[in-house]
Curated annotation (Swiss-Prot):
Pathway: Carbohydrate degradation; 2-deoxy-D-ribose 1-phosphate degradation; D-glyceraldehyde 3-phosphate and acetaldehyde from 2-deoxy-alpha-D-ribose 1-phosphate: step 1/2. This is Phosphopentomutase. Binds 2 manganese ions. Pfam families: Metalloenzyme. Keywords: Cytoplasm, Isomerase, Manganese, Metal-binding. The keyword Metal-binding applies. It comes from Shewanella sp. (strain W3-18-1). It catalyses: 2-deoxy-alpha-D-ribose 1-phosphate = 2-deoxy-D-ribose 5-phosphate; alpha-D-ribose 1-phosphate = D-ribose 5-phosphate. Its EC number is 5.4.2.7.
Length: 404
């Protein structure tokens, strides 16, 4: 029985990529800087001491990062019995965003330029917002700027609740984000507004519209809920997910995967929120998955809760939780199963600003007859998609080189 389990540690980069200078990210290193902060006692909130990831280390994380950066991260070294194949991958796509990383990993790199709202204030064209408001029957909006999602709730959440005006904001990514209170504005109203916005953005080539629902009564307790929804464009070509589905296989999305691929190539969607819930749901799906199945999970908290919020201790604690549960996953794998752990970009919690960082991502592969050892530097995330196609004996993808 052949299956592939993909565990996407959203934003878990392993060092600045060769083209990082083009993105202002030279020196960024999500994994390395977290490990360094832990070793120096600077990440002892909710946890303490050096970063402890023994299971990821056995799968080759420390070695993959060493090959990427030229040095082992603090607390990681050669004194580990490797059980997995490991490498690091350069992104071929033009952006450092979520859709680009995910699509490329599935065999379809983004070779065009996304549209962006580059102005930090008055970010959105009036012509665009006028059309959105008219169609939605709204008399105004708040925000219209680059912002941290949590900070903008503190600044504008109460005014939003009083006025009923949605909060529009963006970032360095190709994204239009809309924050609204679940009770005072209504979740269905937020989703409808996002659907309208997605349609009106067609001429702008924006990658995603993101619904950012929140609850609470004031700045001290405003919090995003688990009802986030991404409205993505469809990938420009068939991904390996589409090809497996067309061949009669199953593709199970856990978390936000289905949204990222605009439901293309997905046969089942499982909703889950938070690291524990996502891990539980992944294990449950693997236990019940049959032959020719992909179970694909995005562990978004690493990015949204820790990377963007520049929370080093939180990121470290999340990684240690994830690592402690990996033996549960390994115990479920058959000899023909393929487990892949990777990321879609970096988001160094020690870096300036709040945006993603252009980094190599780890490629940790276990099972399917792979020998423990180095896979080297991969020239594209698409090598993962090509390897999955090879594993299932599907028609080869147009991009990528298999390591199977």
């Amino acid at each position: 029985m052949k299956r592939t389990i993909i565990m996407m540690l959203d934003s878990f980069g392993v060092g600045a990529s060769a083209d990082a200078a083009s993105f202002g990210d030279v020196g960024s290193d999500t994994f390395g800087h977290i490990a360094k902060a832990c070793a120096e006692g600077k990440a002892d909130i909710g946890r303490e001491g050096p970063l402890k990831l023994p299971n990821l280390a056995r799968l080759g994380l420390g070695h993959a990062a060493m090959e990427s950066t030229g040095a082992f991260a603090p607390g990681f070294g050669d004194n580990v019995e490797l059980i997995g194949a490991y490498g690091h991958a350069q992104e071929l796509s033009s952006g450092k965003d979520t859709p680009s990383g995910h699509w490329e990993m599935a065999g379809v790199p983004v070779l065009f330029e996304w549209g962006y709202f580059s102005e930090h204030q008055n970010s959105f064209p009036k012509e665009l917002t006028d059309k959105i408001l008219a169609r939605a029957g709204l008399d105004g909006f708040l925000g219209n700027c680059h912002a941290s999602g949590t900070t903008i709730l503190e600044e504008l959440g109460e005014e939003h609740m009083r006025s009923g005006k949605p909060i529009f904001y963006t970032s360095a990514d190709s994204v239009f984000q809309i924050a609204c209170h679940e009770e005072t504005f209504g979740l269905d109203n937020l989703y409808r507004l996002c659907e309208i916005t997605r349609e009106e953005l067609a001429p702008y080539n924006i990658g995603r519209v993101i619904a950012r629902p929140f609850n609470g009564t004031g700045p001290s307790d405003f919090a995003r809920t688990g009802n986030r929804k991404d409205y993505s464009l469809e990938p420009p070509a068939k991904t390996v997910l589409d090809k497996l589905k067309a061949a009669g296989g199953e593709v199970v999305s856990v978390g936000k995967i289905a949204d990222i691929y605009a439901y293309c190539g997905i046969t089942k969607k499982v909703k889950a929120n938070g690291l524990e819930d996502l891990f539980d749901a992944t294990l449950a799906e693997v236990k019940s998955a049959g032959d020719n199945t992909i179970v694909f999970t995005n562990f978004v908290d690493f990015d949204s809760h820790y990377g963007h919020r520049r929370d080093v201790a939180g990121y470290a604690k999340g990684l240690e939780y994830f690592d402690a549960r990996l033996p549960e996953m390994l115990a479920l794998l058959g000899e023909d199963d393929l487990l892949i752990l990777t990321a879609d970009h970096g988001c160094d919690p020690t870096w300036q600003g709040t945006d993603h960082t252009r980094e190599y991502v780890p490629v940790l592969a276990y099972g399917a007859g792979l020998k423990a050892g180095s896979l080297g530097r991969r020239n594209s995330f698409a090598d993962i998609g090509q390897s999955i196609a090879s594993h299932f004996k599907l028609e080869p993808m147009a991009y990528g080189e298999s390591f199977i």
